[in-house]
């Protein structure tokens, strides 16, 4: 593979004399077509490559044409394209399982597709470079355009984890053969087609069974089911009161008894303790402990912290991170890795120093590089990092949301290479009136990485807990009781899901049921989990309630009703997580795509032939009546896309 020269050398490098035939000799500039995923990224590529001449839908110069997609330009055709009878929804026509898949150009992006198609067929273009996002969906976006355009020219793959100019230049010098990503493309195709088959067949099946539009999704429905199960557990929870006796010791500190279910038992102990007036030290145990630095961020971990500390939704965090990536301030955001590769070790100390300086961290930062290096745990992209470009950027000019997300990512880098947080934990066991009382104290020995965390995120972390210092006493010694009181408490129900905890539940779904040695994928991927939550909210299955930082995600009545009528196999997180694991195996070339698709088709066929409407479910699925139709007097009901008269003839 020839080396990509600097832009100033491009004309000489890419101009070659071509003999069209024996009678006609001409000079043609041979160009390479670069296809990015979006215009802003294409602009960054064009700047590095020297393609500075703006055209309609692309840039040109120095041997390159740089154009872009606008999301998915090509999409799966709807059922009626396969057969006109599918316009009408009928259980008799199910399952719909295409043998030969058909695709259409999205109506809203036909112009840009046309531009790409013309560029791919230009006689001076000898090859194409796939420069869409380096991941499963980016691969799919390009390949569908390439195939739909009927392009047969060779193409190579640009694979980047950073949008810095040096990284872009190096990436174009080290283009990958397209065949290295065939398995990734196969996994993307399987994911897209499986989602289509589940969505089309299940949505039609249950809509027909219950007489109203019901949206069902391979990933969406299990996530909704998790929230419904959680709310059912909260509703079924029975609060139980309990009672404890709390002693205030004259030498300092407090001590608590065990819990009593009966108030009378606790009151009896309280009376005895007041009468006895002193405790005997039975055991004093001191242990030194440490808390290791946190791992670097992957996307899901970043989204969880941004929700917990900043109140951002998962989608907001992804949008901010994507913008920072395109501004060359962070590395590729849609990563599922929390480590770096061995070849990054040498440059990491400089990045840590630059990052600390950018955020005015004046204290010396210990740098333990090996804590974050583990190439065996890096998949397509390494963990999220700030870039060196950030050191010279005007951070104050960034929108507040982007600035806060950048601060989180930078703080995590500084913490991850830091020293352990060390503390001493003391447990004091005393006896009063024949009953054991316990006290716990904690004293910080060395702040370690938490000092940097407080410096970077102090206002976001909230008020720190004061250390609890227990009196220095000897075993079998006695201490006077300065006060005793009865305290009443109650057991706590499960907590409502927040975006933070729901992301965690999606990430860890089916962990207990996975066989030993099998890599767990959870529900969805880091790149799709935010979109899944947003889709559930937009379709009216989930709603956000509460203040910004404490918003919870609650299933609506519509969401609860949908899960009530769903068969277990459709709402099962375990099955969906198993599919994600199999998609990963396809991506790695460990599983045949045809085998996976056959499994999906069998499941759908079985579902269609065995599922019947549940008795009484129509009552649950009934739409909300909001008024009377002025035309015919029938009920006007609220549905997903607006208000409709129940009378189909109206």
Question: Can you name each region flagged by the protein language model?
Answer:
Residues 10, 14, 18-192, 196, ...:
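Intrinsically disordered, low-complexity regulatory segments
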Residues 26-33, 109, 120, 148, ...:
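Basic, low-complexity terminal or inter-domain segments flanking catalytic cores
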Residues 29, 79, 124-129, 250-272, ...:
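OB-fold/S1-family RNA-binding modules
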Residues 55-86, 221-265, 414-468, 640-648:
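Structured, non-catalytic alpha/beta "coupling" segments that mediate domain-domain communication
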Residues 101, 123, 165-249, 286-290:
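C-terminal or mid-to-C-terminal helical accessory/interaction module adjacent to the motor/catalytic core
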Residues 179, 263-297, 303:
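Metal- or metallocofactor-binding catalytic centers and their adjacent structured scaffolds
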């Amino acid at each position: 593979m020839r080396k990509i020269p600097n832009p100033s050398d491009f004309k000489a490098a890419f101009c070659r004399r071509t003999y069209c035939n024996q009678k006609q000799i001409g000079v043609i500039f041979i160009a390479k077509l670069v296809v990015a995923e979006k215009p802003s990224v294409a602009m960054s590529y064009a700047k590095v490559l020297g393609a500075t001449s703006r055209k309609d839908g692309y840039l040109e110069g120095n041997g390159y044409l740089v154009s872009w997609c606008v999301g998915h330009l090509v999409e799966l055709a709807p059922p009626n394209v396969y057969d006109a009878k599918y316009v009408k929804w009928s259980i008799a026509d199910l399952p719909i399982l295409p043998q030969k898949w058909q695709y259409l150009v999205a109506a809203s992006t036909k112009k840009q597709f046309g531009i790409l198609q013309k560029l791919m067929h230009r006689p001076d273009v000898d090859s194409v470079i796939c420069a869409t996002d380096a991941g499963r969906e980016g691969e799919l976006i390009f390949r569908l355009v390439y195939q739909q355009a009927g392009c047969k020219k060779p193409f190579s793959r640009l694979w980047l984890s950073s949008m810095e100019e040096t990284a872009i230049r190096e990436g174009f010098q080290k283009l990958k053969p397209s065949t290295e990503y065939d398995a990734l493309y196969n996994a993307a195709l399987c994911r897209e087609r499986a989602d289509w088959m589940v969505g089309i067949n299940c949505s039609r099946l249950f809509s027909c069974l219950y007489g109203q539009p019901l949206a069902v999704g391979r990933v969406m429905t299990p996530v909704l089911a998790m929230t419904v199960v959680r709310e059912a557990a909260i509703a079924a929870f029975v609060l139980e009161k309990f009672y404890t006796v709390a002693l205030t010791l004259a030498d300092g500190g407090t001590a608590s008894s065990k819990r009593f279910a009966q108030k009378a038992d606790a009151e009896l102990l309280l009376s005895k303790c007041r009468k006895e007036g002193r405790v005997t030290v039975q055991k004093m145990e001191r242990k030194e402990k440490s808390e290791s630095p946190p791992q670097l961020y992957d996307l899901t971990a970043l989204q969880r912290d941004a929700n917990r500390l900043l109140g951002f939704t998962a989608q907001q965090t992804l949008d901010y991170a994507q913008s920072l990536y395109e501004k060359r301030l962070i590395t590729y955001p849609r990563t599922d890795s929390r480590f770096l590769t061995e070849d990054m070790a040498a440059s990491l100390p400089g990045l840590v120093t630059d990052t600390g300086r950018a955020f005015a961290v004046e204290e010396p930062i210990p740098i333990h590089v090996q804590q974050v290096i583990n190439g065996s745990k890096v998949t397509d992209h390494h963990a999220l990092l700030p870039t060196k470009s950030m050191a010279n950027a005007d951070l104050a000019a960034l929108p507040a949301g982007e600035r806060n997300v950048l601060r989180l990512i930078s703080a995590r880098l500084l913490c991850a290479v830091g020293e352990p947080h060390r503390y001493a934990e003391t447990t004091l066991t005393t006896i009063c009136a024949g009953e054991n009382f316990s006290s716990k104290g904690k004293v910080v020995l060395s702040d370690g990485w938490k000092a940097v965390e407080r410096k970077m995120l102090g206002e976001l972390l909230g008020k720190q807990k004061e250390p609890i210092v227990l009196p220095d006493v000897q075993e079998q010694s006695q201490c006077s009781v300065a006060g005793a009181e009865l305290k009443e408490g109650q057991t706590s129900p499960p907590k409502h899901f927040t975006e933070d905890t729901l992301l965690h539940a999606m990430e860890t779904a089916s962990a207990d049921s996975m066989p030993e040695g099998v890599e767990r994928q959870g529900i969805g991927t880091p790149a799709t989990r935010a979109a899944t939550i947003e889709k559930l909210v937009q379709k009216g299955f989930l709603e956000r309630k509460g203040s910004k930082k404490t918003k919870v995600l609650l299933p609506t009545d519509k969401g609860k009703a949908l899960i009530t009528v769903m068969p277990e196999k459709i709402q099962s997180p375990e099955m969906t997580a198993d599919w994600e694991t199999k998609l990963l195996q396809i991506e790695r070339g460990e599983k045949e795509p045809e085998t996976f698709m056959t499994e999906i088709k069998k499941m759908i066929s079985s579902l269609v032939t065995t599922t019947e409407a549940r008795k009484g479910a129509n009552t649950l699925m009934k739409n909300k009546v909001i008024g009377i139709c002025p035309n015919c007097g029938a009920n006007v009901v609220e549905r997903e896309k607006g208000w409709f008269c129940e009378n189909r003839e109206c």
